[in-house]
Curated annotation (Swiss-Prot):
Protein name: Xylose isomerase
GO biological process terms held by the UniProt record: D-xylose metabolic process
Lineage, opening ranks: Bacteria, Pseudomonadati, Pseudomonadota, Gammaproteobacteria, Pseudomonadales
Family: Belongs to the xylose isomerase family.
GO cellular component: a single term: cytoplasm
Ligand binding (Mg(2+) 1): E231, E267, D295, D338
Subunit comment: Homotetramer.
EC number(s) from the headed UniProt entry: 5.3.1.5
Domain of life: Bacteria
Transmembrane domains' residue ranges: none
Length: 438
């Protein structure tokens, strides 16, 4: 029995369509810069917000009445949830999905039950993937929801909790490998602290470093060819999280010699919480050589928490996509919709409305970003702005041919008196707007 009987496969109808169940801009096989849209964007729907979240919040119980979320045998419900998920993915026309281990299988009362349940559901997911052609963008382990992880997983003061988390990550990595996932994500949901009064920062950082090295070792042992991705977030649920932002993650990776092994999965809403723009986080990761993938959503700038709304700003997503295209596009990553409908969006059809609109936003942003790249006025301006560093003097400074003292002598001898030059910010903002609102 279908879970979404009133929805046909969502199709491209063009900009003049007024149907909320049709794409106006996302034409999956349309070529952009010589590559189909679907291959540029590599869009994924997430399991947790779409099929697990019951519509609960801090002040109230769940508002949704999803048929796959009723009472009954947990394994039967998990099987039904998988059937609903792949019906949704197929009708939406999205190519990828993502999950946590405990999204797809009941956790059970012991590790033995966990292993049995998860293995059983991986069998089901594999069959659904083969039948539908839908692929796994990434898998991960939920090492934050169970009360045992209240003080963290890898950073926990109890080594047995560390071992329990390692077991889940071991299992989820193996499942991701079997399901031919493109990436494996490590989100440190509670890897942080509530108060420094009971926290040993150095010890917890060393534990995290040891854990990540074990993950890297296991990746190579099982022959996983995808990327390992840390997902930065500054706070929530903890007061302070150790993977605060892209720059912080890079510093951590360098400390433990992992900067060539692990990249970042950047979430728009997490950038907001860190006081950064989404554009900033992507540009920073690209500049550091650790850009991997994207969690596509948005936060509310007036709220200090993770609202995980669907992306709806073509302007924001154009700048993000421009930065990604300039870096060569996704390798293994993609745009994963870590987004959820609002608590008052009660109907199953709302799941389609949110995803369809967001997919159109990304498609339009891709076209605008491609146009910016083809006539790259921003890069032309940057080349001119930094041109002095390409001249012999600038090159010799960068090459280490001057000491601080000899550089000062050079300035005195040549009576240097450089003048400020306009940064042309307003001009460049106008240039961007002309591409976006063409």
């Amino acid at each position: 029995m279908p879970y979404f009987p009133d929805v046909d496969r969502v199709r491209y109808e063009g900009p003049d369509s007024d149907s909320p169940l049709a794409f106006r801009h996302y034409d999956a096989d349309k070529l952009v810069l010589g590559k189909p849209m679907r291959e540029h964007l590599r869009m994924a729907a997430c399991y947790w917000h779409t099929f697990v979240w019951p519509g609960a919040d801090m002040f109230g119980v769940g508002t949704f009445k999803r048929p796959w979320q009723g009472s009954g045998d947990p394994m039967e419900l998990a099987i039904g949830k998988a059937e609903a998920a792949f019906e949704f993915f197929s009708k939406l026309g999205i190519d990828y999905y993502s999950f946590h281990d405990t999204d797809v299988a009941p956790e059970g009362a012991s590790l033995k039950e966990y292993r049995h349940n998860f293995a059983h559901m991986v069998d089901h997911l594999e069959r659904h993937q083969q039948q539908s052609g839908i692929k796994l963008l990434w898998g991960t382990a939920n090492c934050f929801s169970n009360p045992r992880f209240a003080a963290g997983a890898a950073s926990n003061p109890d080594p047995e909790v560390f071992a329990y988390a390692a077991t889940q990550v071991f299992s989820a990595m193996n499942a991701t490998q079997r399901l031919k996932g493109s990436n494996y994500v490590l989100w440190g949901g509670r890897e942080g602290y509530e108060t420094l009064l009971n926290t040993d920062l150095k010890r917890e950082r060393e534990q995290l470093g040891r854990f990540m090295r074990m993950v890297v070792e296991h990746k190579h042992k099982i022959g996983f060819k995808g990327d390992l991705l840390i997902e930065p977030k500054p706070q929530e649920p903890t007061k302070h999280q150790y993977d605060y932002d892209s720059a912080t993650v890079f510093g951590f990776l360098q400390q433990y010699g992992l900067e060539n092994e692990i990249k970042v999965n950047i979430e728009a809403n997490h950038a907001t919480l860190a006081g950064h723009s989404f554009h900033h986080e992507i540009a920073t990761a690209v500049s550091l050589g650790i850009f991997g993938s994207i969690d596509a959503n948005r936060g509310d700038p007036q709220n200090g928490w993770d609202t995980d709304q669907f992306p709806n700003s073509v302007e924001e997503m154009t700048l993000a996509t421009y930065e990604i295209l300039k870096a060569g596009g996704f390798t293994n990553g993609g745009f994963n919709f870590d987004s959820k409908v609002r608590r008052q969006s009660l109907d199953d059809i709302d799941l389609f409305h949110g995803h369809v609109a967001a997919m159109d936003v990304l498609a339009l942003a891709l076209e605008r970003a491609a146009a910016m790249l083809q006539n790259d006025k921003l890069q032309h301006f940057k080349d001119q702005r930094y041109a002095g560093w390409q001249q012999p003097f600038g090159q010799s400074v960068l090459a280490g041919e001057f000491s601080l003292a000899s550089l000062a002598e050079h300035a005195f001898a040549n009576e240097l008196n450089p003048q400020a030059v306009s940064g042309r910010q307003e001009l460049l903002e106008g240039v961007v707007n002309r591409f976006i609102y063409a």
